[in-house]
Design a protein with these regions (language model features):
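Glycine- and charge-rich intrinsically disordered segments
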Residues: 1-35, 261-289
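Binding-interface segments
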Residues: 18, 22, 26-258
Length: 289
């Protein structure tokens, strides 16, 4: 019989942000969830590793530590749920970020009240790891960035996708014109996915919309600035940034993978199942906030 571990909201709120993960109940909940979800006994080992990574992230990003204690707690448990790591070396699998979110309450003037909440953002490489582990694919090659001057041809013949590619050596341009990735399914069939210049511009526009702000003078929302990485490569998109986008785009049409309640993935996901985070708030037991 599984032991019920309760984590009280008021106890979380009384702790400094970096100390949340050192709570005995938080440790027990992380280990319990990790072992149960992944069928292993390595939860204790992973807990200590991720405590170090979590606390380092908060020390390196003091602004992140101002997020609600509840959301920081949820993010830490999502590392167990997602089976990823916060280790930032090499190709990071995920980050912890923060954003302003509505609380559901209004102030005396009738305006929405916001608070800063942390969330886990899964990178393309993190999503690739999760999909391989879920058995959706056998493996995928590293994304290939195509530059002006390279030979590149994408085709679809009788329902079969194919790519012709040859890099120009020496390279004469740093302008990025496309990217593609080769995916091998579990039945050993091959799937190619690609992004052309028009697709990259579309993603850039989405970034502008995501950063839009309300203008009190014009009484309408106005487009914001796109992520600087869309133009940081001498006006072209950053190659590493595009590789990450390429992986995420490649799985748009694939089935969903399980993620934690405090996790966001760029590729579209259907509503996920509710996961017990062991929270106790007044009369509400084991209900994620």
């Amino acid at each position: 019989m599984t032991k019920i571990i309760e984590v009280k909201v008021e106890e979380l709120n009384a702790l400094p942000a970096t100390k949340i993960v050192e709570s005995e109940n938080v440790q027990a909940k992380f280990v319990q969830m990790y072992n149960a979800i992944w069928g292993t006994d390595k939860g204790e080992q992973m807990y200590h590793k991720e405590v170090f990574n979590f606390q380092k992230l908060l020390r390196d990003n003091p602004d992140l530590a101002d997020s609600t204690k509840m959301s920081l707690y949820g993010c830490f448990l999502d590392i167990a749920v997602n089976g990823l790591t916060l280790d930032q070396t090499g190709h990071p699998l995920c980050y912890i970020l923060s954003r302003s979110s509505k609380t559901g309450h209004k102030n005396a003037q009738g305006y929405d009240i916001y608070e800063k909440r942390a969330y886990v953002s899964v990178t393309g490489y993190g999503e690739l790891t999760m999909r391989m582990r879920a058995g959706q694919i056998k493996y995928a090659d590293n994304p290939v960035v195509v530059y002006e001057g390279d030979h590149f041809k994408a085709s679809l013949v009788n329902g079969i996708k194919n790519i012709e590619y040859e890099a120009q050596c020496p390279r004469t341009s740093t302008k990025v014109i496309a990217a593609f990735i080769r995916i091998v399914r579990n039945d050993n069939s091959v799937d190619y996915q690609w992004l052309m210049e028009g697709d990259i511009e579309r993603l850039k526009h989405y970034s502008e919309k995501a950063n839009s702000k309300w203008n009190d003078q014009t009484k309408r929302r106005e487009l914001g600035k796109a992520n600087a990485l869309y133009t940081s490569n001498n006006g072209s998109i950053d190659p590493g940034f595009l590789e990450n986008k390429m992986i995420k785009h490649a799985f748009d049409a694939y089935p969903k993978v399980r993620t934690g309640k405090f996790t966001i993935m760029d590729s579209d996901q259907e509503e996920e199942e509710i996961i017990d985070y062991g929270l106790v708030d007044e009369d509400k037991v084991n209900e994620p906030v």
